[in-house]
């Protein structure tokens, strides 16, 4: 019984330390990688890839053009059909993208790195709790 309690305490300490590290790294994160951009796009955009837009190449685009790709807009909150449609053309399972889309609904109209970071923290904690 004492060993089990000790294991739970150690696991809780590890989870707290990892969460603190995740948050510190998240605060210091100032850019996103291409795979992160694709994840955000697959979770929010109404087309599979932004480069399939007719005006994508040979045109200078402003910040709003890319924020539309990387964020859920006000009129899209609660709509998950984009995730389903995009995943029909992708090899990855849709559960992560559904979670990401849900999290992105809290930061409507602009890009935020936090929905993905919070999902990763939650998944990591749940994996460790299963151990």
Give short role names for the model-derived ranges.
Residues 109, 114-131:
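Transmembrane-helix motifs of polytopic, lipid-linked glycan transferases
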